[in-house]
């Protein structure tokens, strides 16, 4: 199991720690705009997650996890994270409600706050703020363009300590399975602690899903989590931040005991931190990883130790992280146009306004052969049908619009994807989703790479209750829209 850290003698440990830090209560501001804790219906959450689509899964092990986390979007456009527990996790409804409501009372800018729950039949779900910019694991272990900067790593450690201190001050000192997947980044690039780890049920699997090499010693002995166990896990996270790797504590402590702690440091950080700074963080990690729980620091002293180490405090997190401020995360984007967004929300009024505004621009190159045709009375009559249909469409006389557009289509002289799109919406307005789906598919046949055809298919599929298929079709429309946008550039 490795050496007992309590036997490790490091003469440069401080005898006491200064308490110069922001109190947890100072961080309660900035959360007034959060909604109150709410009960959601299962249907609401199913719709928000596109029928709990596999494409909406954001949790670590995907669909194989016992409890899966999905990203979702509510009718008011709020993004949420939805944790759906397996059916055996919370057999006691009362216990689930009590736990959820207790965690739901917490409000802090260092947390991804719990904003709601659902408890219907055997279903148990939690709803939290959605954090768009991935996990600490992603940014630390699987980065794409740049490794995490030293000053940002120090900030992550401090913000996490502040989150734990706040929770402890509110009577929620236990956090289950604290690891790099539990640290999430918000729209400003600030790290936050997931609220999901604050709830635990005796039947909800193990408190630690990670390798036993990273598990607090007392948990291995007793199977119980105590506040000091959370500090131990915090120590393993400090090792992650120091090394950029997931190093077993026993190996790290061997290096520290041999005064080779610089070998722990991430090679990407060479030249970007002082030895004193590295030493201070290693000291703190060592104290957190003491074998005896009583010898570990409390969360308040973690904040005291980390606050003086902060660097570049005037630089916003999104700059340190290389995230363009105000940029939409890929996880937040379901459509690239207002039409796609309106179809995803099944806002028929907005769809009508957009189709009316766009007119027949998208028919260019598809239905513009008329100038090369011989003008006949039949063609003129066909054009008159379309013109009458357009007038009815503009005036929201959808029954007349269907009749006129149908005459135009059945004449067969000309083909217009926009006419199919307009008649599709008329059918949706008339509560005829099956006919609407047929027209949207015909529009796709005429113009195979027209995003509008896919978006309208999605709107029809939503009307038919086929949410999963609708989300897939929205995704196809989004891909075509992105391709179209890239070709322009």
Curated annotation (Swiss-Prot):
GO biological process, alphabetically ordered: brassinosteroid mediated signaling pathway; response to abscisic acid; response to cold; response to salt stress
Active-site residue list: 177 (proton acceptor)
Modifications after synthesis and translation: Phosphorylated by BRI1, ASK7/BIN2 and ASK9/BIL2.
Transferase is among the record's keywords: yes
Swiss-Prot/TrEMBL keywords: ATP-binding, Brassinosteroid signaling pathway, Cell membrane, Kinase, Lipoprotein, Membrane, Myristate, Nucleotide-binding, Phosphoprotein, Serine/threonine-protein kinase, Stress response, Transferase
Primary residence: membrane
Tissues and organs where the protein is expressed, per its UniProt entry: Expressed in roots, shoots, leaves, stems, flowers and siliques.
Enzyme nomenclature, EC number: 2.7.11.1
Lipid anchor positions (N-myristoyl glycine): 2
A Gene Ontology term for the protein's cellular component: plasma membrane
Phenotypic consequence of gene deletion: No visible phenotype under normal growth conditions, but mutant seedlings exhibit enhanced sensitivity to salt stress and abscisic acid (ABA).
PANTHER family named among the record's database cross-references: SERINE/THREONINE-PROTEIN KINASE BSK5, SERINE_THREONINE-PROTEIN KINASE BSK5
Function: Probable serine/threonine kinase that acts as a positive regulator of brassinosteroid (BR) signaling downstream of the receptor kinase BRI1. Involved in abiotic stress tolerance. Required for salt stress and abscisic acid-mediated drought stress tolerance.
Oligomeric form and interacting partners: Interacts with BRI1, BSK1, BSK6 and BSK8.
Identification of the protein by name: Serine/threonine-protein kinase BSK5
Species: Arabidopsis thaliana (Mouse-ear cress)
Lineage start: Eukaryota, Viridiplantae, Streptophyta, Embryophyta, Tracheophyta
Gene designation per UniProt: BSK5
């Amino acid at each position: 199991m490795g050496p007992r850290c309590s036997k490790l003698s490091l003469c440069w440990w401080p005898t006491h720690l200064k308490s110069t830090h922001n109190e947890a209560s100072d961080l309660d501001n900035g959360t007034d705009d959060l909604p109150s804790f709410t009960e959601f219906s299962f249907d609401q959450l199913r719709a928000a997650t596109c029928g709990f689509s596999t494409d909406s899964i954001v949790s670590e092990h995907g669909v194989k996890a016992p409890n899966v986390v999905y990203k979702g979007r509510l009718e008011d456009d709020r993004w949420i994270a939805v944790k759906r527990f397996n059916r055996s996790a919370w057999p006691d409804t009362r216990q689930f409600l009590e736990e959820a409501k207790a965690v739901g009372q917490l409000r802090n800018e260092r947390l991804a706050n719990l904003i709601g729950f659902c408890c219907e039949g055997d279903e148990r779900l939690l709803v939290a703020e959605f954090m768009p910019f991935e996990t600490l694991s992603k940014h630390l272990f699987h980065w794409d363009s740049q490794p995490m900067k030293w000053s940002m790593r120090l900030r992550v450690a401090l913000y996490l300590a502040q989150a734990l201190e706040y929770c402890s001050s509110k009577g929620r000192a236990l956090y289950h399975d604290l690891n790099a997947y539990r640290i999430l980044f918000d729209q400003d690039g600030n790290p936050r602690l997931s609220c999901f780890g604050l709830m635990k049920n005796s039947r909800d699997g193990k408190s630690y899903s990670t390798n036993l090499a990273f598990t607090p010693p007392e948990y291995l002995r007793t199977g119980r989590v105590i506040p000091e166990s959370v500090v131990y896990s915090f120590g393993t996270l400090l090792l992650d931040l120091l090394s950029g790797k997931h190093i077993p504590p026993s190996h790290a402590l061997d290096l520290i005991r041999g005064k080779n702690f610089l070998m722990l440091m991430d090679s990407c950080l060479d030249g970007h931190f002082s030895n004193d700074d590295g030493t201070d963080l290693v000291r703190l990690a060592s104290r957190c990883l003491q074998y005896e729980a009583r010898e570990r620091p409390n969360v308040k002293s973690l904040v005291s130790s980390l606050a003086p180490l902060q660097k570049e405090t005037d630089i916003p997190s999104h700059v340190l992280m290389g995230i363009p401020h105000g940029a939409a995360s890929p996880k937040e984007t379901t459509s690239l146009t207002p039409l796609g967004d309106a179809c995803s929300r099944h806002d028929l009024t907005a769809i009508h306004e957009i189709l009316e505004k766009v007119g027949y621009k998208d028919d260019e190159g598809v239905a513009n052969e008329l100038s090369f045709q011989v003008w006949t009375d039949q063609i003129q009559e066909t054009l008159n049908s379309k013109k009458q249909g357009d007038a009815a469409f503009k005036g929201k006389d959808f029954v007349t619009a269907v009749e006129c557009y149908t005459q135009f289509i059945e004449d067969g002289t000309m083909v217009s994807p926009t006419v199919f799109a307009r008649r599709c919406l008329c059918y949706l307005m008339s509560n005829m989703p099956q006919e609407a789906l047929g027209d949207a598919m015909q529009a796709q046949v005429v113009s195979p790479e027209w995003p509008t055809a896919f978006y309208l298919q999605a709107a029809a599929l939503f009307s038919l209750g086929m949410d999963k298929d609708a989300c897939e079709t929205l995704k196809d429309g989004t891909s075509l829209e992105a391709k179209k946008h890239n070709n322009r550039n």
